[in-house]
């Protein structure tokens, strides 16, 4: 079946640097740029169309043609410059070093060299790109050093470096490029390219040197094995070379060197060839050559270091590439806004809501609500983070896994027990494919599963939930019993170096990892709805789209989804496990052919794609005779399946009577990456400043009336109940939860431009002179351009505004304002303070008045309808604060939908559930906030939860 079913939008951004360029407004582009973007039809002018780039500030420029690093370095036709000579000299030094070393030192030295350059690639370049993506660090370095400013202006302190860079770059790009006219971002990217060239060339060269140092001919290896080993290795290397060349043909130097971290091109990018064959081809199949070289070297050392390098490359993809791709090309869609506010305002506010049960439910508690739409996915089943031992499905799954584990470990591995475990695994595989397949077939044809629950007064949603539990438990038992059988059949090798023992284990582990990755990719593409075959239960199915892994394969579970069972075959070398693997594969293919495909054809018809990206490319590459052979084989296979279908159709009445009665009935991931590592340092020149010249004044959304009401609660002594006797005009500062806080600062005119203000709990720091606790990103610089990131400048309102000094002093002071909001706030209750720090260090020059963040406790009203209205009114400003008052996320009214960013970033929902817990004493999961989608729905849920829990809250 083409399970390219997705509840999300179509997303094709699955290849390495495979980035569709964000379209720009046609009115802001030149005619040439409009031609490049396709907004204007190109005219036949006899000239080659040029590519136009766009910097973040909107500057449009011509992107000159450049060449790949191998051609630049080694091709005699390409001009050479000093940086090329330096790179070639470093490469030559590597070769000479390995050649000159004694035999015993070649392997460790070459390994250290390679690991150094690999770390320079994945950690070094990764760190630079991460900071460039988030803070424009490289461009800011160029701005601060002024290395691209013409020395004729007198502003460049490095004229010789300017001339050197100018000569180097213009030598490499003789056409359509002017160093003086090119944007700062483009010149910075060109310099960054030279660093990348050095690291990548040294990385590959040191790897090859390590492989040469480790290469040997295995003892007693037959001639046939040697030929096969070298032939396979050469094929993998040639395939790797084709992947690299084809990828460069598609993405050019712009994406090859991560150009979109610096600027965008006003041109639609097309991705074909290797980008239709595999996800992230440069990082997945693009490393096949490493394993080919490992084969030719016949060295496990080379194999293991190749695996380490490949894993590091995937880490680079996950932590650097993918976040930038999502930020640049996958912004959240515009939020759904209320079309007619007047209509919304006149709607009667009853206990009903879009998610509330109909009024009839108040009188008939178990009345079913029939809906063709799937319920919102709030409490998912899959994943350790969704484990909930209060749920019977999860408890049952954990118990049966524990029982399987206990029986497996506590019983001996005798032939009789091995037979029992293999038979048990075979039975569960038969149930998982044949039994579940039968149930789904009945559900597809006559809604048998849903009808059973409706017959007993349940809802289709209840039938769906019970089905998910049944399928989940069946899947758990299928794989748990298979793993138990593998455990019983496995024997730990006595000699890991004998024959292919170690290789079999490495390949087996790799296949198991491949199946895990495939399953995760399938789940990410289909979601909970598609994973549990939701379109068998709900007629209103989402549009059939092909994204994620389904962009490349129609049925990834057909081959890749069972790679792990064949990995177990390699590891165990057992005939019984081979039988289980064959049984699993045959049954899975039959399940796809007889259950999934007919249902998909009935549901989606002609919209089902015949060939996925990989198959299309393979067919395109086949010669005509092989294409004809492929067509003949397709006819044979289709005819065979038709025969089997006819046979089963005729036998169905005889089997139905017996089969129809068969079935009737923690992780949490937290991430806390401090944006600032705090090390206590005392600045030597702090003595030249008077701390009395520094001050901080705090302003926020006032909530002090709540504090004043709480001061006299009747729990204090008689004197404490009296009004406060204030000897000044100051009053307690109590601000709303999540509301932005403005900080006004004053400092001497000669204050350091690297001064900064941090937010802390009052109890965090015992010292008033030095801050010894990390700000964890809750800090703002007082001046722009002083630090190499943009995050610390978010919130600056004004800087260095000259004002007269207070207290009548005949001098002037500098002042400014910053606003702390969003991630720069503490999302909890407590007492906090701001600290003004000197010169980028942690010497405290001023501390603000302490202020309290408090969430007002909701006061209940008697009437339910009035209570819900009050809850809505109290909840709306809190939700808006939790959503940073962002117009693309925060609702303006109680009926307005939350922005789509709430679905993508879990912090917003977590803020809301904390506030709800403090206000109403009701604890929700973050998924509830995302599922409700509006303040009104959430208020309805709160009111009903309080009504349900009221009997248990009585004191």
UniProtKB/Swiss-Prot annotation:
It is found in: Endoplasmic reticulum membrane. One of its GO terms (biological process) is methylation. GO terms for cellular component: cortical endoplasmic reticulum; endoplasmic reticulum membrane; perinuclear endoplasmic reticulum. Its EC number is 2.1.1.17. Residues 11-20, 40-51 have a biased composition (Basic and acidic residues). Residues 1-81, 130-194, 244-276, 321-388, 442-472, 517-574 are lumenal. Residues 1-10 have a biased composition (Polar residues). It catalyses: a 1,2-diacyl-sn-glycero-3-phosphoethanolamine + S-adenosyl-L-methionine = a 1,2-diacyl-sn-glycero-3-phospho-N-methylethanolamine + S-adenosyl-L-homocysteine + H(+). This is Phosphatidylethanolamine N-methyltransferase. It comes from Aspergillus terreus (strain NIH 2624 / FGSC A1156). The gene is cho2.
């Amino acid at each position: 079946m083409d399970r390219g079913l997705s509840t999300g939008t179509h997303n094709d951004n699955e290849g390495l640097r495979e980035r569709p360029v964000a379209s720009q407004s046609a009115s802001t582009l030149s005619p040439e740029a409009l031609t490049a973007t396709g907004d204007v039809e190109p005219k036949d002018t006899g000239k080659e169309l040029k590519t136009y780039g766009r910097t973040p500030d909107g500057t449009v420029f011509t992107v000159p043609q450049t060449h790949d690093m191998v051609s630049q370095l080694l091709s005699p036709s390409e001009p050479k410059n000093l940086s090329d000579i330096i790179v070639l000299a470093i490469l030559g030094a590597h070769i000479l070093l390995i050649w000159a070393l004694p035999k015993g030192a070649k392997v460790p030295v070459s390994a250290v060299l390679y690991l150094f350059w690999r770390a320079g690639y994945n950690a070094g370049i990764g760190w630079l790109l991460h900071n460039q993506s988030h803070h424009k660090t490289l461009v800011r370095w160029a701005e601060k050093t002024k290395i691209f400013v013409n020395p004729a202006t007198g502003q460049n302190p490095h004229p010789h470096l300017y001339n050197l860079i100018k000569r180097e770059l213009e030598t490499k790009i003789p056409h359509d490029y002017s160093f003086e006219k090119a944007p700062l971002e483009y010149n910075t990217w060109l310099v960054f390219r030279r660093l990348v060239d050095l690291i990548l060339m040294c990385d590959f060269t040191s790897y090859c040197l390590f492989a040469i140092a480790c290469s040997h001919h295995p003892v007693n290896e037959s001639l046939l094995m040697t030929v096969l080993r070298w032939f396979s290795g050469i094929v993998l290397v040639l395939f790797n070379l084709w992947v690299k060349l084809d990828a460069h043909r598609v993405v050019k130097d712009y994406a090859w060197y991560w150009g979109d971290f610096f600027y965008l091109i006003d041109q639609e990018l097309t991705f074909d060839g290797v980008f239709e064959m595999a996800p992230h081809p440069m990082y997945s199949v693009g490393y096949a050559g490493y394993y080919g070289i490992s084969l030719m070297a016949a060295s496990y050392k080379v194999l293991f270091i190749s695996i380490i390098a490949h894993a590091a490359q995937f880490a680079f993809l996950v932590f650097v590439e993918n976040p930038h791709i999502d930020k640049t090309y996958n912004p959240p869609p515009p939020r759904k806004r209320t079309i007619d506010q007047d209509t919304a305002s006149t709607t009667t506010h009853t206990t009903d809501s879009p998610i509330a049960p109909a009024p009839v439910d108040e009188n008939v508690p178990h009345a079913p609500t029939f809906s063709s739409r799937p319920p919102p996915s709030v409490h998912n089943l899959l994943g350790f983070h969704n484990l909930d031992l209060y749920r019977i499905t999860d408890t049952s799954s954990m118990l049966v896994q524990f029982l399987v584990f206990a029986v497996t470990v506590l019983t001996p591995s005798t032939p009789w027990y091995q037979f029992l475990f293999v038979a048990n695994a075979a039975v569960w595989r038969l149930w998982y494919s044949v039994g579940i397949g039968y149930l789904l077939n009945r559900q597809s044809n006559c809604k048998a599963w849903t009808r059973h629950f409706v017959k007993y007064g349940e809802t289709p949603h209840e039938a769906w939930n019970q089905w998910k539990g049944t399928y989940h438990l069946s899947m758990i038992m299928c794989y748990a019993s298979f793993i138990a059988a593998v455990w019983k059949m496995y024997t730990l090798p006595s000699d890991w170096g004998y024959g292919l023992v170690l290789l079999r284990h490495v390949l087996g582990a790799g296949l198991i990892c491949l199946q895990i990755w495939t399953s995760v990719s399938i789940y990410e593409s289909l979601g909970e709805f598609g994973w549990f075959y939701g379109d068998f239960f709900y007629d209103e199915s989402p549009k059939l789209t092909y994204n994620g892994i389904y962009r490349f394969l129609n049925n990834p579970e057909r081959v890749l989804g069972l790679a792990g069972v064949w990995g177990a075959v390699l590891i165990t070398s057992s005939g019984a496990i081979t039988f289980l693997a064959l049984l699993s594969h045959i049954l899975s293919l039959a399940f796809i052919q007889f259950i999934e495909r007919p249902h998909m054809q009935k549901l989606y018809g002609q919209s089902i794609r015949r060939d996925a990206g990989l198959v299309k490319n393979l067919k395109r590459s086949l010669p005509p005779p092989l294409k004809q052979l492929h067509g003949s084989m397709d006819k044979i296979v289709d005819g065979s399946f038709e025969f089997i279908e006819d046979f089963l159709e005729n036998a169905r009445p005889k089997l139905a009577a017996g089969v129809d009665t068969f079935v009737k009935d923690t992780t949490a991931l937290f991430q806390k990456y401090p944006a600032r590592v705090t090390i206590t340092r005392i600045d030597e020149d702090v003595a030249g400043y008077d701390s009395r010249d520094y001050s901080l004044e705090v302003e926020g959304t006032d909530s002090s009336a709540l504090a004043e009401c709480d001061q006299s609660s009747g729990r204090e002594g008689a004197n404490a109940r009296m009004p406060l006797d204030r000897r000044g005009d100051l009053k307690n500062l109590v601000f709303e939860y999540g509301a932005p806080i403005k900080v006004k600062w004053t400092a001497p005119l000669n204050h350091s431009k690297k001064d900064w203000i941090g937010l802390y709990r009052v109890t965090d720091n015992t010292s008033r002179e030095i801050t010894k606790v990390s700000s964890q990103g809750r800090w703002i610089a007082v001046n722009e351009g002083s630090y190499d990131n943009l995050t610390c400048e978010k919130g600056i309102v004004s800087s260095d505004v000259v004002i007269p000094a207070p207290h009548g002093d005949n001098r002037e002071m500098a002042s400014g304002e910053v606003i702390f909001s969003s991630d720069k706030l503490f999302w909890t209750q407590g007492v906090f303070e701001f600290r003004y720090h000197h010169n980028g260090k942690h010497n405290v020059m001023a501390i603000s008045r302490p202020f309290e963040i408090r969430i007002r406790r909701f006061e209940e009203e008697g009437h339910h309808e009035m209570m819900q209205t009050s809850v809505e009114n109290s909840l709306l400003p809190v939700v808006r604060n939790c959503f940073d008052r962002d117009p693309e996320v925060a609702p303006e009214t109680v009926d307005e939908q939350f922005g789509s960013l709430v679905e993508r970033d879990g912090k917003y929902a977590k803020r809301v559930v904390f506030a709800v817990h403090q206000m109403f004493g009701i604890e929700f999961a973050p998924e509830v906030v995302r599922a409700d989608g509006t303040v009104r729905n959430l208020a309805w849920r709160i009111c009903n939860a309080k009504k349900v829990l009221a009997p248990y809250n009585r004191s």
